[in-house]
Amino acid sequence: MLAVSAVLPDTLPDHPPLILIHSSANSAAVWRCWQQALAEQRWPSYDIDLRGHGQSGPRDLSHTSMQDYAADITVLVTQCRQPPVLIGWSMGGLVALMVAATGAAGACVGLAPSTPAQQFNTSVVLRTGEFGGEEYGITSHDPDEQPAMPDLDREERRAALASLGRESRLARDERQRGIIIEALPCPLLIVTGTRDRAWPRERYNHLGFTADYLSVEGASHWGLVLQRRALSSMIPEVLRWIVQHT
């Protein structure tokens, strides 16, 4: 079973549902600030724990692929009454793009998404196994020792650490080899943070298809999901874009 947390307005919404897709080695818990803000704006949202993550329960992820994660999102998408907007962060952004490429989404928003490829990097060897947050620079559970989260306050860092979990080595290697997406049949917004050293705006210069871009001043990679100061201006901008494009 897949765990999904829905936050719905108490009246019939005028907006399409938003599906929130977390990143590698963490869980849907990273979306707590987003869901609160979306509820205040009366947008229905669904955050999903991908298989083996968070509330979806532990399982062996050694052989889990990116296509498996896309299949998890498709299960939720097919239960929506209208085409949803997919919002994915980092690895989740690439999963969102994979599902959107099938024509299932009304629009797609990538928060510093892992980039799709135009061809395979055949030098990458696909391995099985699991890893954790240490591969992303998180080697301590002390909120005061998190160089990967320079813009988060202590409470936000605690939330980030609480979201951590295991991840599929195979899925990561597949991303390194390349997930090919040739075209996207829906509007795309890519959001980047000016303090994100891993996924700056420049990494999307050769995306291969049309996208709009939003730069968030002072936000790191983690800041795009948990830095409340940045989210207070960023989320309204994202919602305005969605209204204009759906």
Label each region the model flagged.
Residues 53-84:
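Active-site loop/oxyanion-hole signature of alpha/beta-hydrolase fold enzymes
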Residues 25-33, 45:
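Serine-hydrolase catalytic-loop signature spanning alpha/beta hydrolases and amidase-signature enzymes
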Residues 101-136, 171-177:
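Flexible "cap/lid" loop of the alpha/beta hydrolase fold
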